[in-house]
A protein has these predicted regions:
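Asparagine-centered polar/low-complexity signal
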Residues: 9-11, 72, 106, 185
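Short beta->alpha junction loops
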Residues: 72-79
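Membrane/wall-proximal cationic-aromatic binding patches
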Residues: 1-58, 62-63
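Structured loop/turn residues at beta-strand edges in well-structured enzyme cores
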Residues: 27, 66, 94
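Alpha-helical cap/lid subdomain in secreted, periplasmic
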Residues: 53, 57-63, 81-201
């Protein structure tokens, strides 16, 4: 906490960006964006050129009768297990109104280190689903919304890959990761009834 560099500021709560009050101000809707290095903004030139930073600027352009406060709760290398700990041990104490989870890539990488057996995919993704079901249930109890999103990566969607992207796809065994990604995608439907929203981006 309380670290300041030319392109990065870490506030008193340990999040990237400006300070936030532990007690949420009146007429404020507080949103935590949670994920890994993509959310944190690795390589971004400033705090406001991260995903949460751009989102904050969009809301700042509109007068909707109350303040929307976007908090960058991204941590490089974070995956679902560490994100759950962050939510339970810190974020719940900061009066969230909404959690937006940008999820997937780091969990996929963790699985590659965990197992070389594709039969473990269902067990792995069931555990992932159960973690977020727990958080969504807490959201119901404590009156905050939870949005779970799956982040895209090379090979998902209908984009034609460049030679460089295709080479990277083969080098990193993305064909196996795509099987795992599809299993995550299928688990989203199991979260729909408990979470506020789920999306495969």
């Amino acid at each position: 906490p309380n670290q300041h560099f030319s392109t990065i500021n870490i506030n008193t709560e340990g999040f990237r960006g400006k300070d936030i009050s532990p007690l949420k101000p009146d007429d404020t809707f507080r949103v935590f964006v949670i994920g890994g290095s993509t959310v944190y903004g690795t390589g971004a030139e400033s705090d406001i050129t991260t995903m949460p930073g751009f989102l904050q600027r969009e809301f700042d352009n509109y007068n909707i009768g109350y303040d929307v406060e976007i908090v960058n709760a991204g941590i490089s290398g974070a995956w679902s297990f560490s994100e759950i700990q962050l939510i339970k041990n810190k974020i719940l104490n900061l009066e969230p109104d909404m959690l937006v989870i940008f999820e997937g890539w780091n969990d996929l990488g963790r699985f590659s280190n965990f197992s070389t057996d594709d039969s473990d995919i269902i067990t792995w993704t069931d555990t992932w689903k159960d973690r977020w079901l727990d958080i969504c249930q807490i959201g119901h109890e404590q009156n905050f919304q939870t949005i779970i999103t799956l982040q895209p990566f090379v090979g998902t969607g209908n984009k034609n890959l460049s030679e460089e992207e295709f080479s990277w796809f083969l080098k990193n065994d993305h064909s196996r990761l795509l099987k795992l990604y599809e299993s995550y995608n299928q688990q989203l439907s199991s979260l729909e009834d408990s979470c506020s929203k789920t999306m495969d981006l």
